[in-house]
Curated annotation (Swiss-Prot):
It is found in: Cytoplasm. It comes from the Bacteria. Pfam families: RBFA. This is Ribosome-binding factor A. Keywords: Cytoplasm, Ribosome biogenesis. GO terms for cellular component: cytoplasm. One of several proteins that assist in the late maturation steps of the functional core of the 30S ribosomal subunit. Associates with free 30S ribosomal subunits (but not with 30S subunits that are part of 70S ribosomes or polysomes). Required for efficient processing of 16S rRNA. May interact with the 5'-terminal helix region of 16S rRNA. Belongs to the RbfA family. It comes from Helicobacter pylori (strain G27). The lineage of its organism: Bacteria, Pseudomonadati, Campylobacterota, Epsilonproteobacteria, Campylobacterales.
Length: 111
């Protein structure tokens, strides 16, 4: 990955966290943005949020205009990428893998 793209994703992650914190919705204020992946042309960004509630995605979609406006004002950029919000389930996957590895370790210990 090139350094410019990494820097853009890092800046966008910080700006999105600030944008969510500035909203008047308590559910959106408490969301954590875990990762941002920008497309090759940087016209589109996938924003991964930590939540177990699928309803939060519709709230984020409704607030996308305000979020993009905040990012533009705070960054001074000419354009803001289109944002697609995705629930981040990497923590759940990691916990499942840890449980599997623990079971394997217990099985080897009994042999």
């Amino acid at each position: 990955m090139n350094a410019h793209k990494e820097r853009l994703e890092s800046n966008l992650l910080e700006l999105l966290q600030e944008a969510l914190a500035s909203l008047n919705d308590g559910e959106l204020n408490s969301l954590s943005v875990t990762k941002v992946e920008c497309s090759k042309g940087k016209h589109h960004a996938y924003v991964f949020v930590l939540s177990s509630d699928h309803k939060i995605l519709s709230k984020l979609k409704k607030a996308e205009g305000l979020i993009r406006q905040f990012v533009l004002q705070a960054s001074g950029w000419f354009k803001c990428p289109k944002l697609s919000f995705v629930l981040d389930n990497s923590l759940e996957k990691q916990l499942r893998l840890d449980a599997i590895f623990n079971e394997i370790a217990k099985g080897k210990g009994n042999d």
